[in-house]
Amino acid sequence: MGLLSALKDFKVHNMSLKTLFKTLKKQIKYQKKIIQDNQRVKRIKRKDKIKVGFFVLHHSVWKSDPVFKAMLEDDYFEPFIFICPVNNIEDNQAIEDIKTNVSFFEKKGYPVVSSYDENSSNWVDIDSLGIDLIFFSNPHKLTKKEYYAKAYSKYLSVYIPYAHQVSKYNNYKSQYNQDFHNMMWAIYAPHFDDMDIFKEYAIQKGKNVIVTGYPSMEPLLEDNQPNESPWKQQENTKRKVIFAPHHTIDTPELPYSTFIKFSDVIKELSEKHKDDIQWAFKPHPLLKEKLYHHTDWGKEKTDEYYDYWKNSQHCQLEEGDYYDLFKSSDAMIHDSGSFLAEYLYVKKPVLYLSLSEDIRNYQNAFGNKAYDCCTKGHSEKDINQFISEVIDGTAKVDNTFLENDILVHFADKTPTQKIISHIKEKLMDSPN
């Protein structure tokens, strides 16, 4: 018995030594990056103007628009969009997707560069672009290493999360403690709970984190009137409801999705209430591809489902910008991650779908504060009741989260102003 106990103690001790060695190795790596970044800052300070590349995977998750616009109007910055390919799809499809995304930003009048050079049929070497600072919006290995790890290792890099940081999974490693996070020159966090998590779980302990608030949401607070209506014209006035399902149909470590259970229910309800409600189907960009490979769905069934929302007179499919959609809507039904916080900015009724109350275990403190202000939906009965309340105007709205956890970040300066100020303070020789 004593021998077994000794062996167990040795194993635990040995494992802890391995963990310690691994952590020390990473700390040395991160400290080296800090030293290199300090040298980069010194070089950049000699410049009157800096070139800033915003690395983007898809326009649907473009969340740095206010910051980009501010840089366009500031003589110190020369910003441009750099469209990266997405991994795990054929090159031909990746190139077509890049073209679509380039077109999106060109229509906005933004300077944009494709990562694929059609003239040479080669991927662009970012060293040829003269970049001083890179903005990332996704911490995961979703693109070529040249536009991910090699880029943030070699260039001064900052990170604005593409989501509002409401989730909790994998002991926070994926969201807060990858090499990516620890090697950023600066991380612009959307809320104070984010800073607490970085301090506890990241090897850098939040030393490179600045809490600014979430710049992506500025348009929702600046003006609550839509620039133009994104909704299909109807014969009579109807309530406008958004149905926004998440993509995690195959992700047990983050079981947000209720789509498999409720997709047909909500489709049937949209038919039942078509004289009273017009619907916007706003799926997560990754949902369709996952449904294509789902054993109970597949491409044909998925396309038919999407086409229903796209082509029905009382429905529409929304796959891009959603600011005007949020502003002009009357309510939302969803099981999303970031939308859990984002839709609460517009002070409208929201039904959050989940399969059980255990969902709280997959949200951080910030996410749970947002969740507490939502109407909860666990069944078809709950969905029916919410829809009835939306139609008759009795659906409840709770603004506690907005007032306590959001508006504080917009009190004196906007998140964009804080980000611009931080960069200029650190990189300009004599900032104004």
Model-found features: residue ranges?
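Conserved catalytic-core segment of nucleotide-activated headgroup transferases in glycan assembly
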Residues: K63-E73, P215-T302, F410-Q417
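A nucleotide-sugar donor-handling region in carbohydrate enzymes
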Residues: T19-D37, P161, S174-S257
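Active-site and donor-binding regions of nucleotide-sugar-utilizing enzymes
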Residues: G53-L221
